[in-house]
Swiss-Prot record:
Disordered as annotated region, ranges: 133-152
Subunit structure: Part of the 50S ribosomal subunit. Forms a cluster with proteins L14 and L19.
Designated name of the protein: Large ribosomal subunit protein uL3
Cellular component aspect of the GO annotation: cytosolic large ribosomal subunit
Length: 209
């Protein structure tokens, strides 16, 4: 199996035996419950669908309620999919815990970054500001020229300009696993992960480990 769903609890630090301080992010990984198993015959690929956490009964729509009831699991806060390797046997209703990462050294963590709203080029792309004085009165933080002339006669796609910053899917790769606490369903990784406290995270063994 490729990963688990967790929730960002926050950041703290722990100390090694040598007294070195390590900044860590605490990720709570409650048991992921398998709601569906997909196979080559019916779906064209092998994967499992999981849910995590809980959702109030009055917030569960009827199609979701039926789906969870069919799987025989408690309604969770969402549905996610992970590919599975050939030979891996996973059954509907099975619970998968943070113990999955017991022997993993590095992980990739995916989340939704904090939204910053509409941002200018200085904040969004680290553009330099223009002169504060020397005749410049209104163009201190503007991007400047965005193109050439009649040739090519257009602004190229991908041009860095002002716009929405943040609130997008981001993956941080190869974070060191500092501790796996099976009793408390916690995973401690070195460094920061995307998103706000309480946000959902997808944690997978690192592809570049």
């Amino acid at each position: 199996m490729k990963g688990l769903i967790g929730r960002k609890v926050g950041m703290t630090r722990i100390f090694t035996e040598d007294g070195v301080s390590i900044p860590v992010t605490v990720i709570e990984i409650e048991a992921n419950r398998v709601t569906q198993v997909k196979d080559l015959e019916n779906d064209g690929y092998r994967a499992i669908q999981v849910t995590a956490g809980t959702k109030k009964a009055n917030r569960v729509i009827k199609p979701e309620a039926g789906h969870f009831a069919k799987a025989g699991v408690e309604a969770g806060r969402g549905l996610w999919e992970f590919r599975v390797e050939d030979g891996e046997e996973v059954t509907v209703g099975q619970s998968i815990t943070v113990e999955l990462f017991a022997d993993v050294k590095k992980v990739d963590v995916t989340g939704t970054s904090k939204g910053k709203g509409f941002a200018g080029t200085v904040k969004r792309w680290n553009f330099r500001t223009q002169d504060a004085t020397h005749g410049n009165s209104l163009s201190h933080r503007v991007p400047g020229s965005i193109g050439q002339n009649q040739t090519p006669g257009k602004v190229f796609k991908g041009k860095k300009m002002a716009g929405q910053l943040g609130n997008e899917r981001v993956t941080v790769q190869s974070l060191d696993v500092v501790r796996v606490d099976v009793e408390r369903n916690l995973l401690l990784v070195k460094g920061a992960v995307p998103g706000a406290t309480g946000g959902d995270l997808i944690v997978k063994p690192a592809v570049k480990a």
